[in-house]
Amino acid sequence: MTFPNFRQHDSKDCGPSSLRIISYYYGKHISLQRLRELCHINREGVSMLGISDAAEAIGFRTSGVKITWQQLRDEVNLPCIIHWKQNHFVVVYKISHSKGKYWIWVSDPAIGLIKYCEKDFLSAWLSSTDNFDITKIKNNSQGIPIAKLLSEVMSGINNTHGIALMLEPTPKFYEEKGDDEKKFGFGYILGYLRPYKSFIVQILL
């Protein structure tokens, strides 16, 4: 089955479009307009924090982190949203290994489905910031201005990490009806089973 891809309407829609792609992968059709509103999109676009807030509003559990290539490759449950080329968001949905090389499969709202070799992927994903932790921003109980807090969170220089937003659907995600969909259709059932696909494969084997 081909991994979903939705094209962004303009350059500011990459974040909401990436979330729309993952929602559809898990069986839920949500309109771009609704996600744009939940992401608090503005003339500059959207932040990772805005995408995280929107994802949690529709029933995902999220974790925004700075991770190494090895962590993304070996530990992260895909698909996830990553910060791309410092000004864009895309979905990583598969990492494969063939003939001694790693290949990263991306659903990009700007250009569609594309496969990258490790070198090209890392050159676009690894950033010059370190110590990114979205929970520090969310738990800002002292009322520190967001611009200042972001500056503190994104401080440091390290080209070994990239930003990723990991998403896990909760029961709330499946309980809420999406836009223009039949809740109990095949897509809904398939999406509900996706988080457990590894266990299903083990049972079938």
Residue spans for each PLM region:
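Membrane-integrated ABC transporters
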Residues: M1-H9, P16-L205
